[in-house]
């Protein structure tokens, strides 16, 4: 039953990601333009929808809030809630949680929400669609698989120092 719990925790992290995205685009998708290609960002600046400074600030805030928040979430789930001890127990749980979130990001956010709805459309940039190109998708899938495994291994190794 532990695997079911860990999958549910991954879904919880995916829901947090969706909430963060929904908050980010609540006043229009330009609020999350830092996640778009440089071409879309340039167009938004040219159209005076935003400034380079706002894009940089939003990207920094996104990273400063989300990365530590996601790390805290997975560590609390794996070590405080699930009671993982040792490298392997921590690693597999971290990997499953992050992988489930990654799948939700790829399919629910990228493919469906960004690719098939107008919620992420920025007026004046429609000719630059698809916003997530095949090349972008390949990078995201590569990072989402290899990257999540590396992050899980690093976090599990660090946590071995603190949790016995």
Residue ranges and their predicted role:
Residues 7-31, 97-113:
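Hydrophobic alpha-helical membrane-embedded segments
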Residues 9, 83-100:
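Interfacial segments of alpha-helical transmembrane regions
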Residues 16-58:
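Interfacial loop at the N-terminal end of multi-pass membrane proteins
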Residues 41-55, 121-139:
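Short membrane-interface loop/juxtamembrane segments of multi-pass integral membrane proteins
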Residues 98-110, 132-151:
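C-terminal halves and exits of single transmembrane alpha-helices
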Residues 106-126:
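Juxtamembrane non-transmembrane "cap" segments at the membrane-aqueous interface
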Residues 155-164:
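Juxtamembrane boundary at the C-terminal end of a transmembrane helix
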């Amino acid at each position: 039953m532990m695997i079911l719990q860990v999958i549910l925790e991954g879904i919880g992290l995916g829901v947090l990601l969706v909430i963060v995205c929904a908050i980010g685009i609540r006043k229009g998708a330009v609020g999350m333009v830092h996640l778009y290609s440089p071409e879309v960002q340039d167009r938004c600046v040219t159209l005076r929808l935003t400034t380079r400074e706002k894009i940089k600030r939003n990207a920094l805030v996104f990273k400063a809030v989300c990365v530590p928040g996601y790390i805290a979430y997975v560590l609390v789930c794996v070590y405080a809630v699930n009671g993982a001890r040792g490298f392997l127990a921590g690693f597999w749980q971290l990997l499953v949680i992050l992988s489930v979130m990654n799948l939700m990001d790829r399919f629910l956010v990228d493919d469906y929400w960004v690719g098939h709805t107008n919620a992420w459309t920025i007026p004046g940039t429609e000719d630059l669609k698809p916003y997530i190109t095949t090349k972008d998708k390949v990078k995201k899938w590569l990072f989402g698989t290899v990257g999540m495994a590396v992050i899980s291994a690093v976090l599990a190794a660090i946590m071995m120092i603190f949790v016995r």
